[in-house]
Amino acid sequence: MKFSLFALLFVVVSCVDVGTQTRDAFILAHKQPLSTYAVENMDFVLEYGLYNVGDKPAQKVTIDDRHSFPTNSFDIVKGLLFVHFEQIPAGSNVTHSVVIRPRAFGFFNYTAAQVTYYTDNENHHVTLTNTPGEGYIYRQREYDRRFAPKYTYFLVFFLIVAPTTLGSFLLFQQSKARFPNVIKKKST
């Protein structure tokens, strides 16, 4: 009896809660670097994702990340750091990518981007993306030394190994040329 009464109470409370949940637009935002390493004078790709998890569309949505990447430290190769979307429907998402190029090396603090939107014509909301935090921008020379392909090492290895391999092959060919009859007699 207690269990059935408790179950009935739970069902009634759940139904009342579901019936009263009509949420306005609610934007979840993230900022994510797609490049593995930030290197001076090389492209660095960032992706912004906006997800409307509300029941209504978000109007006049803007992403503003101009303060994170000042033009004296970064070149904008492709994309914009200030983007405007007229509407993001309920239950949908939008992504935006930007390609920037760091001008200098060293530590850099990647701050959050500001996202503003309206749930209807009056309710103005401001939210922030996640913050990737502090990152390191490698020097081009240091990046090449650590991560670039080591073609010179392979070339040196080939120059060291080639004489012994080539010498063995030439000795085999001379030996084979001296005894052609032995090979023919064994095969017949």
Curated annotation (Swiss-Prot):
Residues 1-15 form the signal peptide. It comes from the Eukaryota. It is a single-pass type I membrane protein. Pfam families: TRAP_beta (PF05753). InterPro entries: TRAP_beta. It is found in: Endoplasmic reticulum membrane. Residues 173-188 are cytoplasmic. Glycans are attached at residues 93, 109. The keyword Methyltransferase does not apply. Keywords: Endoplasmic reticulum, Glycoprotein, Membrane, Signal, Transmembrane, Transmembrane helix. One of its GO terms (cellular component) is endoplasmic reticulum membrane. Residues 16-151 are lumenal. The chain crosses the membrane at residues 152-172. TRAP proteins are part of a complex whose function is to bind calcium to the ER membrane and thereby regulate the retention of ER resident proteins. Heterotetramer of TRAP-alpha, TRAP-beta, TRAP-delta and TRAP-gamma. Belongs to the TRAP-beta family. This is Translocon-associated protein subunit beta. It comes from Caenorhabditis elegans. The lineage of its organism: Eukaryota, Metazoa, Ecdysozoa, Nematoda, Chromadorea.
